[in-house]
Amino acid sequence: MNLSPAQNFLEAIRFGSPEYMPRGNEDIFHTLQIKNNFFYGNWTDQWGVNWVMDMPDTSPFPKVNPLPDITKLDDYKIPNPDDLFTDMDEEKRKVKKAKAEGKLVICGMSYFLFERAWAVMGLENFLVALIEEPELSHILLRKIALYAKRVFENMLELGADMISFSEDLGTQRALAFSPEHFHEFFLPEYRVAFEDTLKAKKIINFHSCGCVESIVHSLADINVSMLNPIQSRANDIKKIKEITTNKMALSGAIDSHLLLVGTTKEVRDETARVIEILKPGGGYICAPDQGFPEYPPENIDMLYKTAVELGRY
């Protein structure tokens, strides 16, 4: 068929007929930048969360939480999502150019629902609120979901083919809360936030680090298009593949720890092992399960050489 890389990617994540397994290093995306979404430095976002970068070349972390007590929710003002999308004429021109070049346009939002709630409240405060103040927790999460829904609407209006966001739900061993809490508090709000994106048949790229194998079936059931990064040391990737085949694509799964400290032979063997599990039937984008600038170049080179060698369908 001689598909373009972007067309091949779409065939793969839709469980169609890709010519090869897509790879994370392919130049097929244009990233649409929205203003005041996230900065690498010390800053205060539109929610009133103060971010501090404790070490150079790392991500800042929420240090001041504007709503530590959820019983004060009535006094807390949710920001206007449209404020992220002012003065976008230059970005519109870039989107038009990217689409003319055959690229897919991706637009991302940092700190989606769970992450946004705990950034606003503080992690411990929010987890306690889920148990002690469930009604107020539902109200807060619905407010955040409606904010996100409007953000996604704006992204689509600007021409986004894919929406992405960070929503780390897992620790190394399990979810940060019970699966029951996930289904009660979070899954209904995902449905609200994704409504327009699903109607527009655009791609939902869901990012969650940690162990998420207990909820991947639910993410697939609400039509999440793709899940990343599938941390291999936190999840049973065979189990996840069985659950998501023909339902939800997977991206990542190549052990980042091994990429950092392993030999090229170990990297090749691990990449081949993961490809053997995740490639069959489509729906897999081969990439590291975390992004680090310190990866030895020879290991990254081996990863993608192996992916090319073993990637044909």
Region locations from a protein language model:
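Helix-coil boundary/capping segments in enzymes
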Residues: I28-R93, A98
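Active-site loop segments of alpha/beta catalytic cores
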Residues: M1-G24, I28, I78-Y313
